[in-house]
Amino acid sequence: MKKSLIALTLAALPVAAMADVTLYGTIKAGVETYRTVKHTDGKVTEVKTGSEIADFGSKIGFKGQEDFGNGLKAIWQLEQSASIAGTNSGWGNKQSFIGLKGGFGTVRAGNLNSILKSTGDNVNAWESGKATEDVLQVSKISAPEHRYASVRYDSPEFAGFSGSVQYAPKDNSGANGESYHVGLNYQNSGFFAQYAGLFQRHGEGTKATVGEPVEKLQVHRLVGGYDNDALYASVAVQQQDAKLAAAPNSHNSQTEVAATVAYRFGNVTPRVSYAHGFKGTVAKADGDNRYDQVVVGAEYDFSKRTSALVSAGWLQEGKGAGKTVSTASTVGLRHKF
């Protein structure tokens, strides 16, 4: 009897050691069609059409923790892209880190989402492949969202408020240079508000003119909305500005807004988003970088893990005789594990 108990205990040891390690991921893909019509001086000068089987950003990851007692834990995560279209490779190319979590908050170091990117789910709730992301996702306002080799601190929540700070050293950021990130969040009874700021002394910017590097990049974003079991609504406002490195007193700047509304009816969740980019400054002159975008679609949940996706988008960049109009649509499937 004692031998049986000893054998059973020894057999359970590896299981106990693995108990705090979780395998997770998302597989998502679909069929896409797209069309882009470019105008010059009021005439159609270029038409592009296409269709493809596209991966929507599938991923696989491992995460775990070790409890030291007294509320202190070591936490880690290793996450990577896992395209079913065979377009991604490498380990840790998505959010991956190691850190500590306790009553003081959470400290992590690794390849981390920027604080700006952490607000992204309330700005862009859509799925698509790379070829159509400008049309089927609210991606123009999301362009400054990146991951950085950085260290990040997230505070615990106090009366609905929480904050974050993040630093990416210059040596880990390549040509982008060092960057600083701050964030403030509030939530109460389904209502939420978020602020995220990015400050980068040297970087390519997101509204940069080709061949003209920028510096002193700033991005400020405010997001507010309401989220309960059925109704979701959000509004985002973003301002970004950068100085052209080789041109004194010149700036690339733009203000953008986006709004999304969704409502769940049983297993079906229809959704609509609208985004607008106001006329900004490119180099020293007013730039025609205005745009308008509409995305409509719905999700049907077969279960808690598997959903069917359908969406269509329209994007107009510029105005009048020099505008470019793009449309796209997709039907896809997503499974979470």
Swiss-Prot record:
Subcellular location field: Cell outer membrane
Keyword field: Cell outer membrane, Ion transport, Membrane, Porin, Signal, Transmembrane, Transmembrane beta strand, Transport
GO cellular component labels: cell outer membrane; pore complex
GO molecular function annotation: porin activity
One matching Pfam family: Porin_1
One of the GO biological process terms: monoatomic ion transmembrane transport
Source superkingdom: Bacteria
Gene3D superfamilies noted in UniProt: Porin
SUPFAM superfamilies named in the record: Porins
N-terminal signal peptide: 1-19
Membrane topology label: Multi-pass membrane protein
Similarity-based family: Belongs to the Gram-negative porin family.
Reported function: Serves as a slightly cation selective porin.
Subunit structure: Homotrimer.
Protein's recorded name: Major outer membrane protein P.IB
Organism the protein comes from: Neisseria lactamica
Gene name of the encoded protein: por
